[in-house]
Swiss-Prot record:
The beta subunit is responsible for the synthesis of L-tryptophan from indole and L-serine. Pathway: Amino-acid biosynthesis; L-tryptophan biosynthesis; L-tryptophan from chorismate: step 5/5. HAMAP family: Trp_synth_beta. It holds the Pfam family PALP. Transmembrane segments: none annotated. Its cofactor is pyridoxal 5'-phosphate. Belongs to the TrpB family. This is Tryptophan synthase beta chain. InterPro entries: Trp_synth_b_CS, Trp_synth_beta, Trp_synth_beta/beta-like, TrpB-like_PALP, TrpB-like_PALP_sf. PANTHER family: TRYPTOPHAN SYNTHASE (PTHR48077:SF3), TRYPTOPHAN SYNTHASE-RELATED (PTHR48077). PROSITE patterns: TRP_SYNTHASE_BETA. One of its GO terms (molecular function) is tryptophan synthase activity.
Length: 398
């Protein structure tokens, strides 16, 4: 791709597959990002906001009860404690500072679970930027607490009634808005996917998750973990955790996609293991698509994982074998959600519950194995309590 400063590809994945009208805008964004990375004033403001507004560094918490009777030590990286309730706040602050640097006067965003929307709304309120959030109508219904939070903080929330009324449709509407208003508007993309330079920007603005984890685990255990585990939808919390450990070959990187009702049912959101390569959302990456290239509907109980593609760096890490990607069903995630609440007094987001469920599987499979695991607890579960309550009530569990 001619004229980019940074490499727009991760192996064969990534790129900038957008209408011609948006190419100069993406190049402007890339230039602003590269300059900001080398600007001590920008970095100082970003770090100050992370520390004094968002509440970094976040804790690394040892599970005291979940691993009883086993030889595993399980730590949780507590992104749920970040202001806004999830890891999303990290990169939102960075992108809004970039937007201001470029002279943009309006922010738009897409959101699935509502966490990125909340993070965008709170940061826009604090940094005094008008904000519009596109959200699938289905997600507006299942994430009503977050919709109220966004509106309370001054964001305009637009329910998207098209297609499957989910995250992919919200992404499409946000792209349409941006294409029409790019001169004044910054599209604050919420995950490590989309056209270049978004996957790189989001990784760089999330990588403090892994950097902090590395320092914290060395201080507590005097060694690196055997594995770090994170849920993967678009992939921002996972790449934020993985980035610092990619060069540490002794550390397994495990990403967890949503198996939904089970891979065999077709109702899942696992394009890495069960999709095929194509062009979607401005990038080349694995997608859930039909044989004639129509995008299939993804499914997960977790709105934030309900996405038919995945960030290109994850596709690359999967292809070269540096990271492994597994899947967890809705039922397994709900069990993990309950277990963490009951035994550790922490209510995780359903997204994070997928990663936790896989960690618990590893522990149960080999209780005598001495292992040190870290799960990225990417968000808190307040937004999911009504969904889980309904399911458990229907099953007669509560």
């Amino acid at each position: 791709m001619m004229g980019t400063i940074l490499n727009p590809y991760f192996g064969e994945f990534g790129g900038m597959y957008v209408p011609e009208i948006l190419v100069p805008v993406l190049k402007q964004l890339e230039k602003a990002f590269v300059e900001a990375q080398h600007d001590p004033v920008f970095q100082q403001e970003f770090q100050d906001l992370l520390k004094n507004y968002a509440g970094r560094p976040t804790a690394l918490t040892l599970c005291r009860n979940l691993t009883k009777g086993t030889k595993t030590k399980l730590y949780l990286k507590r992104e749920d404690l970040l202001h806004g309730g999830a890891h999303k706040t990290n990169q939102v602050l960075g992108q809004i500072l970039l937007a201001k640097r470029m002279g943009k006067t309006r922010i738009i965003a897409e959101t699935g679970a509502g966490q990125h929307g909340v993070a965008t709304a709170l940061a826009c309120a604090m940094l005094d930027m008008p904000c519009r959030v596109y959200m699938g109508a289905k997600d507006v219904e299942r994430q009503s607490p977050n919709v109220f939070r966004m509106r309370l903080m001054g964001a305009e929330v637009i329910p998207v009634e098209k297609g499957s009324c989910s995250l992919k449709d919200a992404c499409c509407e946000a792209m349409r808005d941006w294409s029409a208003n790019y001169e004044t508007t910054h599209y604050l993309l919420g995950t490590a996917a989309g056209p270049h330079p978004f996957p790189t920007i989001v990784r760089e603005f999330q990588k403090m998750i892994g950097e902090e984890t590395k320092c914290q685990i060395l201080a507590k255990e005097n060694r690196l973990p055997d594995a770090v585990i994170a849920a993967v939808g678009g992939g921002s919390n996972a790449i934020g955790m993985f980035a610092e450990f990619i060069a540490e070959k002794s550390v397994q990187l495990i990403g967890i996609e949503p198996a939904g009702n089970g891979i065999h049912t077709g109702k899942h959101g696992a394009p890495l293991r069960h999709g095929s390569i194509g062009i979607y959302f401005g990038m080349k990456s694995p997608i859930m698509q039909t044989q004639d290239g129509q995008i299939e509907e993804s499914y997960s109980i977790s709105a934030g994982l309900d996405f038919p593609s995945v960030g290109p760096e994850h596709a690359y890490l999967h292809t070269i074998g540096r990271a492994q990607y597994e899947s967890i069903t809705d039922d397994e995630a709900i069990e993990a959600f309950q277990a963490l609440a009951k035994h550790e007094g922490i209510i995780p987001a359903l997204e994070s519950s997928h990663a936790l469920a896989y960690a618990l599987k590893l522990i149960v499979q080999n209780p005598e194995k001495e292992q040190l695991l870290v799960v990225n607890l990417s968000g808190r579960g307040d937004k999911d309590i009504f969904t889980v309550d309904k399911i458990l009530t229907e099953k007669g569990i509560i």
